[in-house]
């Protein structure tokens, strides 16, 4: 676990090709990864479940383990929480707050918002000492274990590449080659459907339709 694989090499190479606008090679590399047995989780949140790490959607992730010689635990519980005192044993650093714009950009019904981001309020945590007007922080990398204190106590791995990344890279490359490519839209819509808690393999009302302008898409 935690070692680079042929799948992670091909997926990373696809990402490099994408930055170089070498779309044909993006399609080539993503095609190879799609033949390697990876699968998307039906539930988006499973990607960040400590009990499901290195699972079917994982291509490469940084490994963390607490109280293990030679292996570091994560300290995301500190980084991604506001500075407050004695809240269920957690103490946050107050680093890396999420912007209001990011929090509000999720569409209504998109389940990813409350998985990815948490809004901390004075009403919920009256002893929170934060000067942030909008104290939102990354939520998906929190380890819920009471043993996961802020200093390297978390066991939640950090995903670098997921199979969903392959879908999205492929969608972008296919669309760049041919803006009416049906597969490009299907790759994108598979990810969108899951985000809204729908069957990934069935057309839905939230699907992105061909022919949208950039402004409409955004």
Each model region followed by its residue ranges:
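N-terminal hydrophobic or amphipathic segments with adjacent small-residue motifs
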Residues: 55, 83-86, 104
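Active-site core of glycosidic bond-cleaving carbohydrate-active enzymes
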Residues: 61, 88-118
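Acidic-aromatic pocket-rim loops
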Residues: 68-91, 97
């Amino acid at each position: 676990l935690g070692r680079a694989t042929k799948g992670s090499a091909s997926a990373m190479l696809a990402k490099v090709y994408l930055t170089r606008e070498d779309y044909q090679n993006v399609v080539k590399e993503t095609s190879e990864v799609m033949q390697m047995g990876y699968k998307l989780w039906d539930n988006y949140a499973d990607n960040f479940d400590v009990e499901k790490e290195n699972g079917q959607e994982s291509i490469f992730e940084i490994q963390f383990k607490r109280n293990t010689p030679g292996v570091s635990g994560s300290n995301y519980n500190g980084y991604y929480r506001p500075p407050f005192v004695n809240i269920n044993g957690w103490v946050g650093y107050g680093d890396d707050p999420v912007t209001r714009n990011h929090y509000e950009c999720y569409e209504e019904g998109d389940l990813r918002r409350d998985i990815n981001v948490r809004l901390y309020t004075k009403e919920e945590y009256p002893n929170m000492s934060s000067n942030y007007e909008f104290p939102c922080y990354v939520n998906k990398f929190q380890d819920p274990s009471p043993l996961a204190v802020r200093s390297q106590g978390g066991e939640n791995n950090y995903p670098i590449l997921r199979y969903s990344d392959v879908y999205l890279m492929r969608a972008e490359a296919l669309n760049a080659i041919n803006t009416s490519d049906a597969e490009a839209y299907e790759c994108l819509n598979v990810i969108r459907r899951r985000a809204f808690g729908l069957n990934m393999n069935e057309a839905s009302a939230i699907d992105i339709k061909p022919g949208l302008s950039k402004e409409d898409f955004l």
